[in-house]
Swiss-Prot record:
GO CC terms: ribonucleoprotein complex; ribosome
Role noted for this protein: One of the primary rRNA binding proteins, this protein initially binds near the 5'-end of the 23S rRNA. It is important during the early stages of 50S assembly. It makes multiple contacts with different domains of the 23S rRNA in the assembled 50S subunit and ribosome.
Keyword set, alphabetical order: Ribonucleoprotein, Ribosomal protein, RNA-binding, rRNA-binding
Record bears the keyword 4Fe-4S: no
Top-level taxon in the UniProt lineage: Bacteria
Organism: Paracoccus denitrificans (strain Pd 1222)
GO biological process, one term: translation
Name used for this protein in its record: Large ribosomal subunit protein uL4
This protein's encoding gene: rplD
HAMAP family, A to Z: Ribosomal_uL4_B
Binding partners and assembly: Part of the 50S ribosomal subunit.
């Protein structure tokens, strides 16, 4: 598929041929869902924790005699049945991550790129070269192009001036091509790729 290439100041800079195997697929919601779930589960801290029966600080003395009180048989004040007792089978620190085959991850990225292309939310710019690392320059480019919440993906390395200038802008994320991932692509309204970014992604996903 062919796509127009623009400059940062919204001028024309020719066109580019995008691989149909990467940008022209019919997006599959099930694949995207699987990959996003995998990403979010891997990022989850898993630090949730409660005190169990063995963790609660109480005397281990039997609270009252076994027989003759008319009450139920109890040995420990730590039991979950008592107020301030331990929690039965409560959450403990653990990893929520699970495995997902590399082929599924790569296919998910292709479908995320295809989804943006199909929705008309994919933009290709010539380069991210700016003279100085000035936030105003990037803010002007974002405004002129009508971008609201945007993810910008460059080649192997992001233009340093652009990355520094974009740091203070809310709703503008900048990644190198190796950092491209399904979750970040889908959570932003517009995906902006540089020519170098397109080449790097196509080489990565061949």
């Amino acid at each position: 598929m062919k796509l127009d290439v623009i400059t940062l100041d919204a001028g024309k800079a020719g066109d580019i041929d995008l691989s149909d195997d990467i940008f022209g697929l019919e997006p599959r919601a099930d694949l995207l869902h699987r990959v996003v779930r995998w990403q979010r589960a891997k990022a989850q801290a898993g630090t949730h924790s409660v005190l169990g029966k063995s963790d609660v600080s109480y005397s281990t003395k039997k609270i009252y005699r076994q027989k003759g009180t008319g009450g139920a048989r109890h040995g420990s004040r730590k039991a979950p049945i008592f107020r301030h007792g331990g929690v039965y089978k409560g959450p403990t620190p653990r990893s929520h991550a699970f495995d997902l085959p590399k082929k599924v991850r790569a296919l998910g990225l292709k479908h995320a790129l295809s989804a943006k292309a199909a929705a008309g939310e994919l933009v290709v710019v010539d380069s991210l070269n700016i003279a100085e690392a000035k936030t105003a320059a990037v803010a002007k480019a974002v405004k002129e192009n009508g971008w609201k919440r945007v993810l910008v993906i460059d080649g192997a390395e992001v233009n340093e001036n652009f990355a520094r200038a974009a740091r203070n802008l809310e709703g503008v994320d900048v990644l190198p091509s190796m950092g491209a991932n399904v979750y970040d692509i889908l959570r932003r309204d517009t995906l902006v790729l540089t020519r170098a970014g397109v080449e790097a992604l196509e080489a990565r996903l061949k």
